[in-house]
Amino acid sequence: MFGGKGGMGNLMKQAQMMQDKMAKMQEEIARMEITGEAGAGLVKVTMTGSHSVRKVEIDPSLMEDDKEMLEDLIAAACNDASRRIEENQKNKMAEVTGGMQLPPGMKMPF
């Protein structure tokens, strides 16, 4: 079924190597910082790969504007950063898995 003993052993070795690569990739993802923007860069939010907000930058020109608009821009920048993190994680994991597609809704790690 697996090409004899060597085949199964090789399969297990490959699985272990992939698991090790994934662990390293997860550490790298957690350390990375991604910046999302809104209002053509007037509001920027920097998040870690684990979705913790590290920094919020607001262009001084917005401080005179309407509070509700500023709140909307901050929320939009957070959402943009989060989307970029998800996209980056997907790309990094594709490197580890060799482009293996996961079923819809399933995220790595399992």
From Swiss-Prot:
Cite the InterPro entries for this sequence. Answer: YbaB-like_sf (IPR036894), YbaB/EbfC (IPR004401)
Compartments (UniProt record): Cytoplasm, Nucleoid
Keywords annotated in UniProt: Cytoplasm, DNA-binding
User: Which Pfam families does UniProt cross-reference here?
Assistant: YbaB_DNA_bd
Region: Disordered, residue numbers: 90-110
What is the residue range of the signal peptide feature?
none
GO terms for CC? bacterial nucleoid; cytosol
Tell me which SUPFAM superfamilies the record gives.
YbaB-like
Q: Please give the Gene Ontology molecular function terms for this protein.
A: DNA binding
Q: Which domain of life is it from?
A: Bacteria
Q: What does this protein do?
A: Binds to DNA and alters its conformation. May be involved in regulation of gene expression, nucleoid organization and DNA protection.
Alphabetical list of HAMAP family matching this protein: DNA_YbaB_EbfC
Similarity comment text for this entry: Belongs to the YbaB/EbfC family.
Quaternary structure, per UniProt, is: Homodimer.
What is this protein identified as?
Nucleoid-associated protein Sden_2380
Organism of derivation: Shewanella denitrificans (strain OS217 / ATCC BAA-1090 / DSM 15013)
